[in-house]
């Protein structure tokens, strides 16, 4: 009697979409846009309506922005046409016709793009750290400054702390998978770092190096100095707060000029034109 063939069960890692996993594990666009809108209103006394999302990837934030108010408009800029195509199919296509009319995705270089002027330009998830040379970062900040309306504000995020200067892995258990952030290499002479995002699944399969980054670990002070040189009138620093009892980070960012010697922290740099 012939033996029945045994069919291998498909590995979860072969079936998942890396972009969906990234959006679920890394991005928190609702909180980020709440922070942007609330901070802008507190500083300028009015609500922002136009946003340019730099290094937008799948444009999840831009899509969320146009859904919030019928007067909101967003432009997403990313040099990678493939990730923009994914974002259009999965994030833009489900929008209403009115919302689609108020969003535009541009496959362009943020150093060269000219898409008009905006209340807000934002670059989150540390994507702008791709620029490792001081002159290039200053040029980028100058381009952002030019892209803002007269009372516009730019928003950037940053991280730091003594653990940021070492190789390490951080694991987070999420619904159906494990997110792994790896700082794989760090050169203390140049502050260049190489980082990866991996995903691990309940069946033991893995999606290694789903996303790779070659960044410079910029300090908040040097970034603020560059923003001033680029023409920004004022910068503010908002650092994520920690729970007093658990020492775990919470969804609150406080404006400050001094923090303890944290092992790690995340901050927003807010630059006023």
Would you name each region that the model predicts?
Residues 87-88:
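Conserved SAM-binding loop
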Residues 155-226:
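SAM-dependent methyltransferase
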Residues 58-71:
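Conserved SAM-binding loop of SAM-dependent methyltransferases across substrates and taxa
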Residues 111-121:
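A short acidic, Gly/Pro-enriched loop at the edge of an enzyme's catalytic core
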Residues 95-110:
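Conserved SAM-binding strand-loop segment of SAM-dependent methyltransferases
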Residues 217-273:
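C-terminal lobe and adjacent flexible extensions of AdoMet/dcAdoMet transferase-like proteins
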Residues 137-150:
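A short glycine-rich, Lys/Arg-flanked "PGG" loop and its adjoining helix->strand segment in the class I
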Residues 47-57:
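Conserved class I S-adenosyl-L-methionine
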């Amino acid at each position: 009697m012939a033996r029945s063939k045994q069919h291998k069960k498909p590995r979860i890692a072969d079936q998942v979409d890396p972009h969906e996993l990234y959006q679920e594990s890394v991005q928190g666009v609702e909180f980020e846009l709440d922070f942007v809108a609330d901070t802008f209103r507190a500083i300028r006394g009015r609500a922002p309506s136009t946003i340019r999302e730099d290094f937008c990837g799948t444009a999840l934030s831009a899509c969320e922005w146009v859904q919030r108010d019928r007067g909101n408009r967003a432009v997403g800029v990313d040099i990678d046409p493939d990730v923009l195509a994914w974002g259009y199919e999965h994030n833009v296509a489900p929008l209403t016709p009115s919302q689609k009319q108020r969003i535009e995705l541009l496959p362009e270089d943020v150093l060269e793009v000219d898409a008009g002027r905006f209340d807000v330009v934002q670059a989150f998830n540390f994507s702008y750290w791709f620029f490792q040379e001081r002159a290039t970062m200053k040029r980028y900040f100058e381009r952002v400054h030019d892209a803002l309306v007269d009372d516009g504000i730019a928003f950037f995020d940053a991280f730091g702390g003594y653990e940021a200067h070492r190789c390490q892995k951080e694991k987070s258990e999420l619904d159906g998978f494990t997110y792994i952030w790896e700082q794989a290499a760090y050169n203390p002479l140049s502050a260049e770092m190489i980082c990866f995002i991996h995903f691990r699944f309940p069946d033991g399969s893995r999606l290694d190096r789903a996303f790779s980054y070659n960044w410079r670990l910029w300090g908040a002070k040097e970034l603020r100095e560059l923003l001033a040189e680029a023409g920004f009138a004022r910068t503010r620093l908002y650092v994520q707060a920690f729970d007093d009892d658990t020492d775990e980070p919470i969804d609150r960012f406080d404006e400050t000029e001094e923090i303890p010697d944290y092992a790690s922290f995340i901050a927003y740099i807010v630059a006023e034109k």
